[in-house]
């Protein structure tokens, strides 16, 4: 009920209090506003106790890894390995699973994994000069994928097959079975699926998809980027046929996670490489002046060339520790409360349309559009007038957007032709509201009220802004660039 404070809201009060920036204010053309952060699926927020732990406990002993002789080197090496083991336990990795960290999120690790699998090694990708049809890998994806789990596969040797959407645009295992039947002669079959949509928060039955892949001689990889901060991850469920052969996620999306690296965990039997993806320091047992050398046997060490991102992985492990402290069951209950209230409030606003409106069992992601108002104008008005931080656009899920917004082939090509000519004004999109268990009921009521007022007054308020067709952004007429000058000042260590 509006204004009602639940027991789970009380439970998350301390976690909220420790979130860096929870009371941060900033200046807008309409006065000073307090940040109400609703962009969690894009990135998490820093957490005070983790920042203090990084600076006060780990910081004084920071030194390069790859040694267990010096005090700093040995402590950081041990801390790095302990962090890796902690992450593995969290996802119920098995003794034959290995962990590799790379880059800043899931995009980096899935591309690295594709290279490790040898899927980007042919000079003639996606042509008959490289592989026969039966030898060419086939990768099955769904219509809800983030671009990272879609476009990255297009740049491999594999044929990429998008499964037909099920009822209400859900992911239907029957569609996978039909595709597997069609490609039954392929020797190398991969299913790479999102655990959850980053647009609508709708879950996929990924263990059922894993079962089908394994029953048909394939492999199953799962992208947990959107859902990892909120749900249990189990690579090895009770039924072995539903195991996950590889998982990817972005710890920066966790509370306390910004600044961490991308994480993947996979079955070591998939590793066939004779050389690491990035040869370098720490990847060899020995070299000599005659061009001879030997790479280390450990896959995790071999694929961790150079100085590893040990602080990034330590931070990821601490963010996971925080998630475990909050408890996934508590998170689920609070998410359900917030989603239910968001649906009640938003569906009552005339002209506001929620995407995937028939599915309320979802992660805390509610995307919508408002008749007659550009999605980026709505985002700008929420920020300038109310302090509410959301995201507008296609959320790096443009293909899903075609289905959600019923964009036809001809319409799509008219839009893409305009985009190719530098005009983004017809690019479809929506506003994404990300809910988080630390969010209060009062904050959510503010969001609902703000959207109601924007629906009523947005057209008039738009007169304060100019629109740039090339960037698809709105700028307030009184914006004099002071924000950029403020950011520059942040880099002055003497102030």
Regions found by a protein language model. Give the residues of each.
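Pyridoxal 5′-phosphate
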Residues: 1-495
């Amino acid at each position: 009920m509006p204004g009602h404070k639940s027991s789970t809201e009380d439970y998350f009060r301390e976690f909220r209090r420790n979130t860096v920036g929870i009371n941060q204010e900033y200046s807008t053309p309409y006065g000073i506003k307090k940040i109400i952060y609703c962009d969690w699926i894009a990135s998490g927020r820093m957490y005070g106790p983790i920042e203090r732990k990084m600076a006060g406990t780990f910081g004084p002993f920071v030194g390069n890894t790859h040694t267990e002789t010096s005090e700093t080197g040995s402590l950081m090496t041990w801390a790095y390995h302990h962090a890796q083991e902690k992450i593995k336990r969290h996802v119920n990795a098995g003794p034959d699973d290995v962990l590799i960290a790379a880059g800043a999120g899931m995009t980096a690790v899935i591309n690295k994994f594709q290279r490790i699998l040898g899927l980007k090694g042919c000079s003639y990708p996606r042509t008959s000069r490289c592989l026969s049809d039966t030898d060419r890998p086939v990768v099955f994806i769904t219509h809800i994928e983030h671009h990272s789990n879609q476009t990255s596969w297009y740049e491999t040797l594999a044929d990429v097959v998008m499964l037909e959407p099920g009822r209400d645009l859900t992911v239907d295992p029957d569609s996978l079975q039909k595709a597997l039947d069609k490609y039954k002669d392929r020797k190398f079959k991969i299913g790479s699926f999102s655990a959850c949509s980053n647009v609508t928060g709708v879950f996929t039955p990924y263990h059922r998809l894993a079962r089908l892949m394994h029953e048909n001689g394939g492999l199953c990889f799962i992208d947990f980027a959107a859902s990892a901060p909120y749900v249990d991850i189990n690579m090895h469920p009770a039924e072995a046929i539903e195991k996950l052969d590889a998982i990817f996620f972005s710890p920066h999306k966790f509370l306390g996670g910004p600044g961490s690296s991308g994480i993947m965990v996979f079955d070591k039997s998939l590793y066939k490489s004779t050389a690491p993806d990035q040869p370098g320091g720490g990847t060899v047992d020995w070299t000599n002046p005659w061009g001879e050398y030997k790479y280390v046997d450990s896959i995790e060490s071999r694929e961790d060339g150079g100085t590893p991102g040990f602080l990034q992985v330590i931070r990821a492990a601490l963010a996971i520790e925080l998630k475990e402290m909050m408890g996934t069951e508590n998170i689920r209950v609070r998410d359900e409360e917030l989603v239910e209230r968001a649906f009640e409030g938003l569906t009552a606003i005339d002209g506001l349309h929620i995407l995937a409106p028939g599915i309320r069992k979802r992660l805390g992601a509610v995307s919508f559009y408002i008749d007659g108002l550009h999605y980026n104008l709505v985002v700008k008005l929420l920020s300038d007038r109310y302090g509410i931080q959301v995201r507008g656009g296609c959320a790096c899920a443009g293909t899903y957007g075609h289905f959600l917004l019923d964009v036809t082939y001809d319409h799509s090509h008219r839009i893409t032709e305009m985009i190719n000519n530098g005009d983004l004004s017809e690019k479809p999109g929506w506003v994404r509201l990300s809910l988080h268990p630390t969010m209060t009921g009062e904050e959510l009521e503010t969001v609902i009220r703000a959207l109601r007022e924007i629906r009523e007054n947005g057209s008039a308020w738009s007169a304060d802004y100019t629109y740039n067709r090339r960037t698809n952004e709105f700028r307030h007429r009184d914006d004099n660039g002071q924000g950029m000058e403020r950011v520059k000042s942040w880099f002055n260590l003497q102030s």
